[in-house]
Amino acid sequence: MADLLTITKVPGRVTIFHLAGKLDGQTNESLLEAVRKEQAAGMRFLLLELQALEMITSAGLGALHNMFKMLSPKAEMEAWEKEHHGEPYKSAYFKLAGAPPNIYYVLNIAGFLSNIPIYPDTPTALASFGD
């Protein structure tokens, strides 16, 4: 996991997980444990920076799905669904940045980009969280 994850905290608001290497069955649980640990310490907003991620497997996609569920308030999602009739809920709490083309392709074809906002780079993604 040490090779996969580096954590940066933006003062007062967003935690950035910088991923590198492979997100697969060997690393997914460690990533989820890091999310749990940061959430317990008060993390509310998470940006996953993917620039150095080389590969994501189905286990890695499962980890992203679990992270989305962990960081998206259920009541907010339910209210969105009632109000927006079939439009997908986009997380305000969990976002992605800097995905290489091969990772972007997998995320898109698997349907993740319907619910998780993605940005071309970290500064743009950070700005999307607002103040």
Task: Show the residue positions of the predicted features.
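Amphipathic alpha-helical interaction surfaces in cytosolic regulatory modules
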Residues: G25-N115
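Short acidic-hydrophobic, aromatic-tinged amphipathic segments that line or gate anion-handling sites
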Residues: P117-D121
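Short beta-strand/loop segment at the start of cytosolic alpha/beta domains
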Residues: M1-H18, L23
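Residues at or immediately preceding the N-termini of alpha-helices
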Residues: N28, T122-P123
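A short, charged, amphipathic alpha-helix used as a generic interaction element across diverse proteins
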Residues: A125-D131
